[in-house]
């Protein structure tokens, strides 16, 4: 799980948005870091989903 950081750089979890809608079991999640000072909004990156076997949009979850 993401741990608390003392500075502006924090760990965030990215979860696939297309996988939830497909109804297939399992989830595709990535852990990355972001700088809260530079990117205040939630991250949205294209990452590879091994279950769907293609690149999909992954959004930051709380």
From Swiss-Prot:
What are the UniProt keywords, alphabetically?
Answer: Ribonucleoprotein, Ribosomal protein
| GO CC aspect terms | cytoplasm; ribonucleoprotein complex; ribosome
Gene Ontology MF terms in the entry: structural constituent of ribosome
Which superkingdom is the protein from?
Answer: Bacteria
GO BP: any one term: translation
Name the Pfam families for this protein.
Answer: Ribosomal_L33
State the Gene3D superfamilies in the record: Ribosomal protein L33 (2.20.28.120)
- Respond yes or no to whether keyword Cell division is given for this record: no
> Does the keyword Ribosomal protein belong to this entry?
yes
List, alphabetically, the NCBIfam families matched.
PRK00504.1 (NF001764), PRK00595.1 (NF001860), rpmG_bact (TIGR01023)
* Family in the record: Belongs to the bacterial ribosomal protein bL33 family.
Q: Which HAMAP family match?
A: Ribosomal_bL33 (MF_00294)
What name goes with this protein? Answer: Large ribosomal subunit protein bL33
Which source organism? Bacteroides fragilis (strain ATCC 25285 / DSM 2151 / CCUG 4856 / JCM 11019 / LMG 10263 / NCTC 9343 / Onslow / VPI 2553 / EN-2)
Q: What lineage does UniProt assign to this protein's organism?
A: Bacteria, Pseudomonadati, Bacteroidota, Bacteroidia, Bacteroidales
């Amino acid at each position: 799980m993401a741990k608390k950081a003392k500075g502006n750089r924090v760990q965030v979890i990215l979860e696939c948005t297309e996988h939830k809608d497909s109804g297939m079991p399992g989830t595709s999640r990535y852990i990355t870091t972001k700088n809260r000072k530079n990117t205040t909004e939630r991250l949205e990156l294209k990452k590879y989903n091994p279950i769907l076997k293609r690149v999909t949009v992954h959004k930051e979850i709380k």
